[in-house]
């Protein structure tokens, strides 16, 4: 399995630790940068990770910046990417199993290296649970990537809201 990884200058050390961990587990790592502590901008590296995943160069991606918010927002702008900013195992597993997330994002100054490694390992091993409901939700999310006339429709999510009101979703 190939994992693309990218970060900004604030968390280069953390990225390298995660990269070393992944290599020790036998994964091929595609390092999308940055490679040092020279000031740079996280959108560049979020985009590179996202493109590596959607182009098939990588199976999954990992994005890390100081808080994780910026780089995760950037990678999610790449059409076909479903990235989740996570700080715990439960969120990471939900993202993969229910939403078929293909990138995972972290705040390298928020979440410690060891916890990041544990979460990433579980994320990689988790499998998407394909159900009709999950497929519909993912299709709705994907539909937002391009402009469609019915996207402006105030009833765009009505089907899901009605199911929520009927108690069909459980938190």
Swiss-Prot record:
Natural source organism: Streptococcus pyogenes serotype M5 (strain Manfredo)
Subunit structure and binding partners: Heteromultimeric protein consisting of LacA and LacB.
Enzyme class: isomerase
Molecular functions (GO terms): galactose-6-phosphate isomerase activity; ribose-5-phosphate isomerase activity
Catalytic reaction annotation: aldehydo-D-galactose 6-phosphate = keto-D-tagatose 6-phosphate
EC number: 5.3.1.26
SUPFAM superfamilies: Ribose/Galactose isomerase RpiB/AlsB
Pathways involved: Carbohydrate metabolism; D-galactose 6-phosphate degradation; D-tagatose 6-phosphate from D-galactose 6-phosphate: step 1/1
Keyword Isomerase in annotation: yes
GO biological process: D-allose catabolic process; galactose catabolic process; lactose catabolic process via tagatose-6-phosphate; pentose-phosphate shunt, non-oxidative branch
Keyword entries, A-Z: Isomerase, Lactose metabolism
Family: Belongs to the LacAB/RpiB family.
Record carries keyword Isomerase: yes
A Pfam family of this chain: LacAB_rpiB
Protein name listed in UniProt: Galactose-6-phosphate isomerase subunit LacB
């Amino acid at each position: 399995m190939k994992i693309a990884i990218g970060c900004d200058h604030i968390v280069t050390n953390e990225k390298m630790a995660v990269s070393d961990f992944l290599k020790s587990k036998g994964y091929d790592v595609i390092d999308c940068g940055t490679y040092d502590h020279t000031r740079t901008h996280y959108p560049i590296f979020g985009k590179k990770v996202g493109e590596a995943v959607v182009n098939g160069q990588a199976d999954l991606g990992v994005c890390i910046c100081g808080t994780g918010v910026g780089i995760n927002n950037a990678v999610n702008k790449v059409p076909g990417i479903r990235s989740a900013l996570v700080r715990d195992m439960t969120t990471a597993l939900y993202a993969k199993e229910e939403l078929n997330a293909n990138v995972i994002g972290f705040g390298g100054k928020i979440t410690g290296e060891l916890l990041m490694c544990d979460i990433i390992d579980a994320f990689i091993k988790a499998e998407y649970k394909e159900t009709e409901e999950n497929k519909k939700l993912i299709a709705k999310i994907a539909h937002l990537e391009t402009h469609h006339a019915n996207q402006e429709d105030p009833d765009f999510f009505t089907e899901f809201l009605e199911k929520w009101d009927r108690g069909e979703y459980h938190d």
